[in-house]
Amino acid sequence: MPQKLYRSLDANLAFLEERFGRSDDFYTKRLMIAGIPCAVVMFTGLSSPEKLCRMALDMLDRDPAMLGGGEGLCVYLLTQSRIPAEPDAVEDTTALVELLTNGLSILLIDGVRKAVAFSTQEMPQRSISAPTGEGNLRGSQEAFTELLRNNISLLRRQFRTGTLTAEIYTAHTRAKTEYCLCYDSALAPKETIDALRARLEQVEIPVLLDSAYFASFLKQDKLNLFPAAAYTERPATACARLCEGKAIVLVAGCPYALVVPSFFAEHFECLDDYASSAVFAGLIRILKYLAFLLAVFGPGLYVMAVAFAPEIIPVRLLTKLAQGEVSTPLPPMLEMLSVTLLLEIVREAGLRAPQSISHTVSLVGALIIGETAVSAGIVSVPVLTMAAAATIATLAVPSLYEQSILFRFAVILLAGCFGVPGLACAALTILAMACGSEPFGYDYLYPLLPPGRASLRDGFVRSIWSRLAKSGEVIGRHEA
């Protein structure tokens, strides 16, 4: 049960001093308004005292209102004054602390068990910049920032409709982090939004620093490696998903939006697909599918062919491969695993190292270590070439990077230990995992499977805009 505010101004200030007194950025200012003892409290790093005085107190001094005591002052500020105060009064200590930590200024009035909140937030923020993880040639070059309400405004600026709904909640974390559920109420299926809202409200974690923290709670099958949600740092991409009837989850402090639900085919799409010609976009999309297959099955297929089925390799190519393998001490499976692990270590080192030396780390690892390993006869040139090709292919579909790496290691192990049956088992397991994934009751492989007109309209390839506009594709309204 929340504790009500005290009637005494001194008692309310004593409570706040006990809670925040050791914080040097906690600001308290006693003042008299129309002869009534009051106090303004705020955090100087989150709110601006100058902004409060300019917006509220100066205006109040010019208003010749007959206030009639503390209660009259509170009612006047909430209902009659031109001062843009919050519409609801603060009545308990829990709400008082929450509003203060959210950057609002609070006016405490002596003799009244209510307080008035003012939106005077002035938080440090990063300016809107270009996306760093989703490169596009055309389209908007804006990216989300760490401020929740800025991100909501970016969505509303591009998605100008009265049906865009933004519901802000406080997560069950110690830090009381806010998150926002955005959707188009005219397009998003109500049962999907209700289910998503219920799952988000049930999440209880110590801290919420990223929208990705929600992802594991949205999956029905926790062992399924395919994601039930996608991520984007582009407001334009988020608006495109809203037009499809999907939901967007924004988290305060995170510049990435969570898109729910997510389908397999969407990982191979980008904004440039819809700004380019249909033929070129279809070609690029097919190349991405081939790159994903190469990233997952390429190294395992090489190990299986060299170790168990050399007869499927052309004679000239087999001769070259044999010359390379003769000089190496490791069997093909261990050789491929070691090179793949080395490339992942180099990638991780380049990613985590300081930006000033990250490129140097990548170049040293990729060129010097690779060349040294081949010259020393530890690994063969064909193995290094295949592993490097698979690593580059993985970058063509960055949103499935984690899945590509995990699947690649599994395929190498199964193909290296059991040959053709192992490779087939790995492929069937991955396919079964994709077919068995049903984010919020929808087919994860739609529109790729089952094959139909949707597969050619906006699946493996993209149709022309006139046909896309007529389809009006929205989740929950799939064609048979």
Language model regions located:
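Membrane-embedded alpha-helical signal segments
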Residues: 1-297, 315, 435-480
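Functionally constrained cores in energy, signaling, and assembly domains
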Residues: 84, 105, 137, 166, ...
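Short glycine/serine/threonine-biased micro-segments
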Residues: 137, 160, 368, 375, ...
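Transmembrane alpha-helical segments that form the functional core of multipass membrane systems
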Residues: 249, 256, 262-411
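Hydrophobic alpha-helical transmembrane segments of membrane transport and translocation systems
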Residues: 381-383, 388-480
